[in-house]
Amino acid sequence: MVMSNLLLCQVNSCPSCCPDVFDIPLESLTHLFLNASRLSHDIVNHTTIMFHEFDEKYAQNQPYTINATKSCHTNSLHTPQEREKALRMNNEDLSKWILMLLYSWHRPLYLLVKDLQSMKEVSDTILSSAKENMRKIEELQAFIERQFSQVIYPVIRTIFKARIYWSGLASLVSNDEDVRHSAFYKLFMCLYRDSRKLDMYTEILACRITNTC
């Protein structure tokens, strides 16, 4: 709470949240948020590896690659895509978007690592990157929850009301190879898109604390 309050004060978005005394040194605060930004960068990098690995092996010149992100399970969240729009948001709202994306992708990544690792489409490279992403997503999620604990319930409520639920498992294990490949491509493409948003929101939180936005 102390950290999120300091950040909120810096952008003048929540004056009533500002305590009179901050217990955490600015240097420590800066280190924590820079580490969060590094985590989000790593998530993008591993997601990019997963996407390109599958794309090069299975998806070249395939019709299902067209408009694949139009049916991502997170589309109804309407998360901001433009940096300019995200920069106009206060830090509490940014933290909500971060948690919404992290929560929404936990199940598909978990199933990819635990239940789908024997699928031929899940190469060692993809599996290794997926495992790294699971670890880093859980670490980033824990950090955001600690600093912005007040948004956890509103985020869960929003996800519930928007009916954000990934239901692609049946297609991923389909006996029809075209159906299976289309589902894997959509999974990796949607994750790639959302990881870039996640990275942008986290980077904005970090650059605000270092005054480098």
Swiss-Prot record:
Pfam families: Hormone_1 (PF00103). One of its GO terms (biological process) is positive regulation of receptor signaling pathway via JAK-STAT. Residues 1-13 form the signal peptide. Keywords: Disulfide bond, Glycoprotein, Hormone, Secreted, Signal. InterPro entries: 4_helix_cytokine-like_core, Somatotropin/Prolactin, Somatotropin_CS. CDD domains: prolactin_like. One of its GO terms (molecular function) is hormone activity. It is found in: Secreted. Glycans are attached at N45, N67. Disulfide bonds join C72-C190, C207-C213. GO terms for cellular component: extracellular space. Belongs to the somatotropin/prolactin family. Placental prolactin-related proteins may play a specific role during gestation. This is Placental prolactin-related protein 3.
